């Protein structure tokens, strides 16, 4: 419910606040989410991942970092709150697909937790990951809803698309519940490492980014 509500909250912020207040809120939400993600990464998630004594943890984290970099090539950086609006533009389905893949991947470790796969991990680690996703989803939903309302979609259809996006992380959780990493030739350390690498890329980009007109160029 929390995963769904965080996205709905982002949509409500866009539709209720005026442009000035919305811009101010986005900046504050981004700064908080970036700082919160970095804090839980270095205080809980990364130390506990390395305690698992996996031999390739660093490689998994780097893979997640690079996967996020590739996804942002198609999404334009909306994962860290950046949206480039052109009034009346067509619905950017490539961006939506990229953002959906990101959300599904980050939900998988939560599902694995509930199956008991990581019962040996501290409960605080799971809670940190959950709240990290929650606080990350709000500014992403704000940016996505802002973009949707600038397209040729009606307001009702924009809410439908946002609702579809809201279902993506729970879909990842369901996948993690139904399929163990070993069933697809992976392990939990690999999946969590990839997710943490993605979070590391997003949080550092939020913290160190200074240009409001930032975009990724390849």
Residue positions per predicted region:
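Intrinsically disordered, metal-sensing/regulatory segments
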Residues: 1-218
